[in-house]
Regions:
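Sec/Tat signal peptide C-region and signal peptidase I cleavage site
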Residues: 28-32
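Transmembrane beta-strand segments that form the barrel wall of outer-membrane beta-barrel proteins
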Residues: 33-39, 60-75, 80, 96-109, ...
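Outer-membrane beta-barrel domain signature
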Residues: 36-41, 72-76, 109-114, 151-157, ...
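Residues that define the transmembrane beta-barrel architecture of outer-membrane proteins
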Residues: 43-49, 79-83, 116-120, 154-162, ...
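Residues on the lipid-exposed face of transmembrane beta-strands in outer-membrane beta-barrel proteins
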Residues: 49-55, 85-89, 99, 122-128, ...
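Repeated loop/turn-to-beta-strand initiation elements of outer-membrane beta-barrel proteins
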Residues: 59-65, 93-99, 131-135, 174-178, ...
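Hydrophobic/aromatic-rich structural module bridging two neighboring secondary-structure elements via a short loop
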Residues: 77-133
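Outer-membrane beta-barrel transmembrane domain signature
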Residues: 140-257, 277-280
Length: 280
């Protein structure tokens, strides 16, 4: 039982947040014991810089737009250009929902090829205030279409992911609002297959593609930041993010009849994020 049913508003808020938070550990797949794990020992350091506009079109209804630039390790090259348009609605003081569209112009690090993506997102968020402290749980479902050539046996053309975030902020240092959060990202439809590893010859045999039904936790993000409310209309956000990334790397031929290599890859990176927002 998550919580005793109560007519008290705070109890209802906590119950909603607890139900949403139950998704935090969902969709994590069991790892096959015979799949090797490769750990990238290099700690990446990247940058994200953004500018956004938030328009309060009607009571509780907000329309937003944002441009973001991300860099590769040590700011050596552009990793992506990203533009988004969103619509959110404040249902009540403790519940919000919204939808977003994002265009992602991504550049592959190895050969700098352009890899455009289109992403549609829907989110729900529960909010609970305790004095100057604010807690929130946000669940975001992302549908991403990859509009470039890919091997369908190695990668998913239309991926479905769930991002689950718990955030804590303190509003007692106005105009500065420090915050911290942790976010889990689960993928729902990565490639699935059957295969047997021949240890004598060090090759994979009896490979069979089974569709897109592998689910697993593929990223943990933690963040420390602060939002500086310069005026009622202008604010700047500073943050340092840490990512633990976990992916299943698959190498097959284009016909999907032979599995050449298979391993899990773990990597870590830090990201410096600076964002400006104009609200009106």
């Amino acid at each position: 039982m998550i919580m005793t049913l109560s007519t008290n508003t705070n109890s209802k808020v906590l119950k909603i947040m607890a139900v949403i938070g139950g998704l935090l550990l969902s969709a994590t797949a069991a790892r096959a014991q015979d799949v090797p794990v490769v750990n990238d020992e290099v700690l990446g350091f990247t940058g994200r810089f953004s500018a956004s506009v938030d328009w309060k079109a009607y009571k509780g209804l907000h329309i937003s737009a944002e441009y973001q630039l991300r860099t590769h390790h040590l700011f050596t090259a552009v990793e992506r250009h990203q533009a988004s348009l969103g619509l959110s609605y404040k249902v009540c003081d403790y519940f919000r929902t919204g939808i977003d569209y994002t265009f992602i112009g991504h550049y592959k690090s190895s050969d700098r090829s352009f890899r455009p993506r289109h992403r549609a997102s829907i989110f729900v968020m529960g909010i609970y205030d305790l004095g100057m402290w604010r807690m929130s749980l946000k669940e975001t479902l992302d549908f991403t279409h990859k509009a470039y050539d890919l091997n369908p046996y190695q990668d998913t053309r239309n991926s479905l992911n769930l991002r689950s975030r718990f955030k804590l902020s303190y509003r007692g240092y106005a105009p500065l609002e420090p915050y911290a959060y942790v976010e889990l990202k689960n993928s729902f439809n990565d490639p699935a297959f059957d295969a047997i590893f021949d240890e004598d010859n060090q090759i994979w045999t009896d490979y069979e593609f089974l569709g897109y039904k592998t689910a697993m936790l593929n990223r943990i993000r933690t963040c420390l930041g602060a939002e500086w409310h310069i005026t009622r209309n202008h604010s700047i956000d500073f943050a340092l993010l840490y990512h633990w990334n976990h992916s299943l790397e698959i190498d097959t031929n284009k016909e999907g009849t032979k599995l050449k290599a298979l391993y899990y890859e773990n990597s870590n990176d830090l990201a410096l994020s600076i964002g400006y927002k104009f609200s009106f």
